[in-house]
UniProtKB/Swiss-Prot annotation:
Keywords: Disulfide bond, Secreted, Signal, Toxin. The cysteine framework is V (CC-CC). This is Conotoxin Lt5.6. Expressed by the venom duct.
Length: 66
């Protein structure tokens, strides 16, 4: 009879140390993927903005590049 309470206490102590569930890992992966996609979109927007500025400067200097 003494083993049952000890077993329950050990079970309660071990449960928070359980590994993450599959759903939690998938959610973390999706969050990381979303952040990566956001970074890529920002870089593309930044590069296209630079190309637009370079094009407008080129058109002001020489009309053959427009």
């Amino acid at each position: 009879m003494l083993c049952l309470p000890v077993f329950i206490i050990l079970l309660l102590l071990a449960s928070p140390a359980a590994p993450k569930s599959l759903e939690t890992r998938i959610q973390n992966d999706l969050i990381r993927a979303g952040l990566t996609d956001a970074d890529l979109k920002t870089e593309k927007g930044f590069l296209s903005g630079l190309l637009n500025v370079a094009g407008s400067v080129c058109c002001k200097v020489d009309t053959s590049c427009c």
